[in-house]
Amino acid sequence: MSKLRSYKKIGGDYRYGDESVARFINAVMLDGKKAVATKIVYDAFSIISERNNGEDALEIYRKAISNIAPVVEVRSKRVGGATYQIPMEVKPSRRSALAFRWLKIYAGKRGGKSMAEKLAAELMDAANDQGASVKKRDEVHRMAEANKAFAHFRF
């Protein structure tokens, strides 16, 4: 029997003590520049709380992540010379990783001055079930729904 891989524990971030925020900072980070990524995320959180009359930015962030995270996705499997898109349930760790990735990508594609402003705008849109990252989640769910007939091929 194979032994399960043990993952390195990530402590919470230093402002909120939240592991999810620490993982999000790591997802935003480019070229190992963690201080820059931390500043971007915390600036985005301060912009969110300013625009929402002092409402807790962490709650808006959590709501946005839960709105973006996909429940099902399609995976390719080759069966008898044909490749099928098989709908599969997404593990919780992958759900959050996909949410972080989509949030970063679609915030970067937005127009705006700084990455912090773009990230804040995308987070607020996602919390309200709008924005490009929520569209991406809906698109993934539609693909899974369209290929429901191949669910019996699960691996």
Swiss-Prot record:
InterPro entries: Ribosomal_uS7, Ribosomal_uS7_bac/org-type, Ribosomal_uS7_dom, Ribosomal_uS7_dom_sf. CDD domains: uS7_Bacteria (cd14869). GO terms for molecular function: rRNA binding; structural constituent of ribosome; tRNA binding. It holds the Pfam family Ribosomal_S7. It comes from the Bacteria. GO terms for cellular component: small ribosomal subunit. The keyword Ribonucleoprotein applies. GO terms for biological process: translation. Keywords: Ribonucleoprotein, Ribosomal protein, RNA-binding, rRNA-binding, tRNA-binding. Signal peptide: none annotated. The keyword Chloroplast does not apply. One of the primary rRNA binding proteins, it binds directly to 16S rRNA where it nucleates assembly of the head domain of the 30S subunit. Is located at the subunit interface close to the decoding center, probably blocks exit of the E-site tRNA. Belongs to the universal ribosomal protein uS7 family. Part of the 30S ribosomal subunit. Contacts proteins S9 and S11. This is Small ribosomal subunit protein uS7. It comes from Chlorobium chlorochromatii (strain CaD3). The lineage of its organism: Bacteria, Pseudomonadati, Chlorobiota, Chlorobiia, Chlorobiales.
